[in-house]
Regions:
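Hydrophobic transmembrane helical bundles of multi-pass organellar membrane proteins
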Residues: 1-133
Length: 133
């Protein structure tokens, strides 16, 4: 009945949504990401510096349709997911980006604030430390 449906599907749906949101978040929220004002923004720099390469084990890369190779996707969204690894392998410039492991990605969860002077993301603890004279 409805109770069984909710008890089975709601946790699965919640976990799936949480993972999806986390994957999107870590692709863009890392310490040395690229954030610029409109007049200083550049397409290629935003693609290569503003999104990361989340290095996943092959099974997880397959399950996530290679979205960890996010910087290639940002440069050209028309590249099918099954060609992202090939594009990465054949283009040395695409390999010179921020690479995050799963552990690195988990650590980015503390990064919440953009520090304009250092042009990087920082956590609240560091912001408090920087604000204290």
């Amino acid at each position: 009945g409805l109770k069984t449906f909710v008890l089975v599907h709601l946790p699965v749906l919640s976990l799936t949504v949480a993972i999806g949101v986390w994957l999107f978040y870590v692709q863009h929220q890392f310490e040395d990401t690229y954030w610029r004002e409109h007049e200083d923004w550049a397409y290629v720099d935003a693609g290569l510096k503003g999104s990361s390469h989340l290095v996943l084990p092959k099974l997880l890369q397959w399950v996530t349709a290679s979205i960890g190779i996010h910087h290639v996707h940002h440069l050209n969204a028309k590249i099918p997911n099954y060609r992202l690894q090939e594009c990465l392998d054949e283009n040395p410039r695409l390999q010179q980006v921020t690479r995050l492991t799963i552990w690195d990605a988990i650590k980015t969860l503390k990064l919440s604030l953009w520090h304009e002077d250092s042009q990087r993301l920082i956590g609240f603890r560091e912001a408090k430390r920087l604000a204290t004279p």
